[in-house]
Amino acid sequence: MKIIISGSTGFIGNNLSNYLADKGHNIIRLVRKTSKNISRNFETHLWDPDNHYLPDKPFIGSDAVIHLGGRKIISLRWTEKIKKEICYSRVNSTEILTKFISKMEKPPSKLIVASAGGFYGNTLDQKVDESDNVGTGFLAKTAEEWENSTFKFKLNKTSVIHTRFGLVLDKKEGAFPLISMPFKYGCLLYTSPSPRDGLLSRMASSA
């Protein structure tokens, strides 16, 4: 399959690109700028959603588009400016992709758009699934707007899939190095009522 991946130089995107390529798929990367985080020789195209620029060539004959783009949410401080960037970068880029695909004569059969488990808000130990309603808070609102941005344009030939990721952990990348830092200095104070002892144990042993 010919698969286009945006956000392909991020933590999840880079690992997913390599995994799918190892499975024999033809991976096309959409990147905002030339990145050093490209571990193998993938076909790469620049796009600029802020200026509504998306190249035609990589989409010709594509089977699926996976959209993972958006400002990193791992930050020491979520200022109002950063929160706006987190939301805008996801909603705007998704709208650009969806609009483009809606106008294609032969569009890809699948559009897979990242979302977040934060869609459900703070559920503590309550189990949720795709039938549950959106929660409250910044992440819930962002995830809702992000998913809704795919509904603004009619996609008759393309199935849309929203993937509500939970916390993805890796010892060297993503959120783990930051959230495991207190363990290294022996100063963690944990008071959450939600039972996450197994997660905490794994974090402590890996720190």
Language model: regions and residue ranges:
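N-terminal Rossmann NAD(P)H-binding glycine-rich loop of SDR-like oxidoreductase domains
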Residues: 3-21
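Conserved catalytic-site loops of classical short-chain dehydrogenases/reductases
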Residues: 64-66, 109-113, 161
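Short-chain dehydrogenase/reductase
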Residues: 87-91, 132-147, 169
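NAD(P)H-binding glycine-rich loop region in Rossmannoid oxidoreductase-like domains
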Residues: 46-92
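Conserved beta-loop-beta element that borders a ligand/cofactor-binding pocket
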Residues: 115, 148-171
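Single conserved hydrophobic/aromatic residue that forms the stacking wall/gate
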Residues: 190-207
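N-terminal Rossmann-fold cofactor-binding loop
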Residues: 30-34
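Conserved Rossmann-fold NAD(P)-dependent oxidoreductase catalytic core, especially the SDR/UDP-sugar
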Residues: 95-137
